[in-house]
Amino acid sequence: MHPARIPREYWRQRFQLAKAMGLNTVSFCVFWNAHEEEEGKFDFKSSELDIDEYLQIAKEEGLWVFLRPGPYVCSEWDLGGLPWWLLRTPDIKLRCSDPRFTQPVERYFHQLAKVVRPHAVDNGGPILLVQIENEYGSYPRRDHDYLVWLRDLWVKEGIRGPFITADGAAEHYLQGVTIPGVAIGLDPGENDAQFALARKMNPGVPVMSTETYPGWLRHWGEGWWAPRDVSGLLKLYMDTRKSFNLYMFHGGTTFGFHAGANGDKHDLTSYDFAAPVNEQGRPTPAYYAYRKQLASYLPAGQSLPEVPAVIPTMEIPSIRLERWSGLWEQLPRPVFSEQPQCFEALGQNQGFVLYRTRIPAGVSGKLSATRHGDPTIYVEGVPTQDLDIPARDKETTLEILVQAMGHINFLIEMEGDRKGLLGTVKVGGTVLMDWEMFCFPLKSDWVTSLRKTSPAPGRMGGIFKGEFKLDTMADTYLDLSNYKKGVLWVNGRNLGYHWSARGPQYRLYCPGPWLKKGVNTIVVLDTELTEPQPVTGSDSAVTTARTLACSRSG
């Protein structure tokens, strides 16, 4: 359970759910890029970033903690938890001994250690296990000195372990990434032969399953979450006294712009993961089945705690929105450059950048550009999918609006996943010069301060705003089935990306604590619509008929 994916007000209830199912330890990832969004500025206190409080509640609820601090964690999180600003260095090598990477890591670990050190087990705290990196055997660089350096850095900061690595359960994943004296985690460990192999690769250390999957990740355009029965694996672990970690026991939501990607497949905003506890914190049938199974291993006369009360949900009648503005009516001051610059060079993580230039008179040919992100092309203000540009007797305005939807979170391709236009843009053989770039990072203060404007004719990228009144607050799922693609904010809180045009997620989870009695404000940005559509609140997530079987990849 990752605190950044769960409303802070619900942390205790989620811990109680874990204990009531029969678990004695909770693992969680620390997302570096959430705590150091801007280089050198750390935040370990705001809302869902207060891991000191999270650890304290775990202790109060009688649970141990398996800490997974990275620096890389994957977890279908933007850039695997690494800060986007690392990519401002053009040739940086991530996850290795490159000093341009290790120096920021050292600074981050120093700040993180101040928070977690008092909670270490040898200081009377709940942190029972600390992970070194994550699935490094799947990374082609395999800098063993880097792994040892991470372990030694923790020791230097007063964190003495115990330590563990986590890798796939095959020899090629484990080769060259084990550390003497450091336990081995398998992602996942599913049979005795895999555990025996791990012991052979690093004799004398404990082995556990660090990621046993009751579900699997999902991308936009794929099927809805599909549960996987792991009762057979639980029997194996319990009968043979093997430690295990359910990934995920409770997934929650990847709020804001934190969802990652695998290649050109973007991760969903929902991180339900078909876990025993669903996105909203409600126990599923699998939860009760696993609870019964684990309870059967208790000594005579002992029982599990009662399952805590569920968090209530509510429906909200149709909310009327109006067209408030649009990206084109909110253009900021441009940045000028001979050639287009990527998002990171412009000091931006995600959101949009509008690139504008002029095609000289008489120039024709196919428009070609290297880009990372989803582009919409405008010629003289008219959207087009035709890349064949005809010659004109006067210069032509070309605009390319690029949306970034999460950096790659797995494998070495993440090193080159800078967003926006990369390098030169050509029409035929002519390189286009002298670019204006308008940056839209879409931060909450920008959304809450939007001025109402008249619409720009024919321009997509509408910003729609509405209000709704509540007498009581509860969790809800805001239904965006009538919209296409964009971002949703409620009371200034970014609930994440919506992409109903692709599915399978059509409703975004809105926690009750983020609502208020009286007037609430909703803002929807949609890249494809020019007219507002109503939004409703549902008491459950939507699913589709399309489901996919769970399988491990990578």
Predicted regions span which residues?
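The substrate-binding groove and active-site-proximal loops of carbohydrate-active enzymes
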Residues: M1-R8, W32-L49, L87-R107, Q131-R142, ...
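Aromatic-lined substrate-binding rim segments of carbohydrate-active enzymes
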Residues: Y10-D78, R151-K156
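Aromatic- and acidic-residue-enriched segments that line the glycan-binding/catalytic groove
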Residues: G40-S46, E60, P71-R95, L147, ...
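An active-site-proximal structural segment forming one wall of the substrate-binding cleft
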Residues: S47-L67, P90-I127
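Catalytic-core region of carbohydrate-active enzymes that cleave or remodel glycosidic bonds
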Residues: L63, K156-E157, D187-N278, R282-P285, ...
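Active-site neighborhood of glycoside hydrolase catalytic domains
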Residues: R100-I179
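A cross-kingdom feature marking solvent-exposed beta-strand/loop segments within repeated
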Residues: A274, N278-A286, Q341-A345, G373-E395, ...
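Aromatic-lined ligand-binding clefts that engage carbohydrates, nucleic acids, or primary amines
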Residues: S364-Y378, L398, F468-N491, H498-W499, ...
